[in-house]
Amino acid sequence: DRQWSRGLGDVYKRQAHMKFTNVRVPKENLLLGEGRGFEIAQGRLGPGRIHHCMRAIGAGEVALELMCKRGIDPNKVAFGKNLAQLGANFDYIAESRIELNAARFLTLDAAVKMDTVGNKVAASEIAQIKVFAPNVALKIIDRAIQIHGGEGVSQLTPLASMYAHMRTLRLADGPDEVHRRAVARYELGKYMS
């Protein structure tokens, strides 16, 4: 039984929802053993989350580039100044670079920890980046949309589509709240006997 659905951020792909009824799997075809499927899935989620975060950082870089180019475009001038010099745009550009670098370094740290001590030990770092990187990308994309004005939410730039994809990414592999909870439990666990 299969149903297709589309959602925000699924502009280029479709997702199938499959329901299995009365399915039997021979014992020799079981992986790890009966009831251990979630364990297998969890083992693959860490690398997938790193991948999501790298995509988020890439999207943030593209948005920052578009923001900067729009900010210095000689054809986009208001009050005798280019857009980068108006309002808080200088701050937005600086904050975007700082936040992108922080997301990149947190992601690299989590990847190194995964490689050296394994996914289970790196679970807190993975959860942290899964919250941080997509949220940073969303903020930067939103700033880029703002500096582009109405064009930023049109199909003339990739920004609106990028925003939809990054917003969806905050739900992929568990929403932010689940990952924040994991980080908090890890932190509290350090102080409990």
Please place each PLM-identified region on the residue numbering.
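Alpha-helical interface subdomain recognition
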Residues: H17-N22, R36, G43-S193
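Cytochrome P450 core scaffold surrounding the K-helix E-X-X-R motif
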Residues: N29-E34
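Active-site/binding-pocket entry motifs
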Residues: R24-P26
